[in-house]
Every structure is written in structure tokens, then in C-alpha cells.
Design a protein with these regions (language model features):
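PLD/PLD-like phosphodiesterase catalytic module centered on the HKD motif
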Residues: 1-205
Length: 205
């Protein structure tokens, strides 16, 4: 049967399978219990997330831009009541305030490590913020890489829990409607950790 679409012409580049930007395209299928939360009228993160997902559960959330996406992280840590033994994140760009907060969490022992992936946009257009993150990670012996990255994923290993945050927001304070999924799932955690580690192993700066 003839295809209804010429993907190369209709949708732009459709390259053959292979490694690009440090990884091959990946997928994972997991079974989780879902909670849906439309929180566009809630005004802060404490009201937005009142309990953490149990293993095998995910919470799907729409927020109204009234809080900084990075503030989800210390709130999760507070609810969990334990320190983060493994911290990974991938984002297009960060604000200087969130870079400072992240390094402070490491210095206070809340984060055992930092594994950071950013977009090359940040490196070229927000060079002062990127350099703060770069030098901060390098001085502390932590890993950072910048490439053609637009993914937004955060991984938090806390005790026996494996929390994953996937969504539309960067680590910035832009007041926008955003969606994200907070999951507690070891398989999904290892899936994202795998491709992040591959990039950082090859291209850490």
C-alpha cells in the first residue's frame, strides 16, 4: 500500500536510523497507575503535589505557570524526607537562580551528585549562566554536557524510590501553562538514565 505521506517533504528531515547527537532514538513502554490532576487554578507547589506517587504510579499535571518548575525538586525531597542519592537532569536552558540553588543543594549534601545535560542554545545565548553551571560542576567533580538537546527530564533517586519528572518546562521562571508527569518507576528511571549516561560519558565537559 502506498504511503499517504512523503515524510521527507511534508514533515521535514526523516533520517535513516542511526546515532545522532550522541544517541540513537529510543523508546520504552511501561505500565503505571495514573492520577490526573488539572491544577490550573492552584497557586503553589505545596497545594499542587500533596503526596508522592508510589512505585508503579504516575501523576499527570497541568500547571498555570504560577511556580518555577525547578521548585518541584526541593518539594519532592521535602515530602520524601530523605536526601537524593542520584540526580540527573536534561533541559534546554536554566535560570541563574536555579543554577545557584542546584549547586547549593549539592554543597549542603542534599544531592550526592549532579549529572547535567543542557542545550547548545544555553551555551551560546546564555553563556554567563552556562559558565556558572559548567565551572560549578567542574569544581565539584560533577558531569555536564551541552549539545543539540531540547528534552526535559529529571531523575531523583531517593531511598528505594525512583522519581522521574517529564514535561514541557525548562528550569526557568517563565510564567507559562506547562504539563508534566511525575512518576515513580525503576524501569523508566533506568531508561532515561541510560541515554543520559551515554551522552555524558562521551561528551562531558
Amino acid at each position: 500500500m502506498k504511503s499517504l505521506f512523503d515524510f521527507d517533504e511534508a514533515f521535514g528531515r526523516n533520517m535513516e536510523e542511526g546515532e545522532l547527537n550522541g544517541i540513537t532514538s529510543l523508546k520504552i513502554k511501561v505500565r503505571t497507575r495514573i492520577k490526573f490532576e488539572d491544577k490550573t487554578k492552584r497557586q503553589n507547589i505545596q497545594k499542587l503535589i500533596t503526596e508522592l506517587p508510589v512505585p508503579g504510579e504516575s501523576i499527570h499535571i497541568v500547571s498555570n505557570g504560577s511556580f518555577d518548575y525547578f521548585t518541584v525538586i526541593p518539594h519532592i525531597i521535602e515530602l520524601a524526607g530523605e536526601k537524593v542519592t542520584d540526580f540527573w537532569f536534561s533541559t534546554w536552558t536554566l535560570s541563574i537562580m536555579n543554577v545557584t540553588a542546584m549547586l547549593d543543594l549539592y554543597d549542603r549534601g542534599v544531592f550526592a551528585n549532579i549529572n547535567a545535560l543542557t542545550g547548545d542554545y544555553m551555551k551560546s545565548r546564555e553563556s554567563n549562566v552556562y559558565n556558572l553551571l559548567l565551572t560549578g560542576c567542574q569544581k565539584r567533580g560533577q558531569r555536564i554536557s551541552s549539545n543539540k538537546n531540547h528534552s526535559k527530564v529529571t531523575l531523583l533517586e531517593i531511598g528505594t524510590d525512583r522519581f522521574i519528572i517529564e514535561g514541557s518546562a525548562n528550569f526557568t521562571a517563565n510564567p507559562r501553562i506547562e504539563q508534566f508527569i511525575l512518576s515513580n518507576h525503576d524501569g523508566l528511571f533506568q531508561f532515561h538514565r541510560g541515554w543520559m549516561d551515554k551522552i555524558l560519558t562521551k561528551y562531558a565537559q
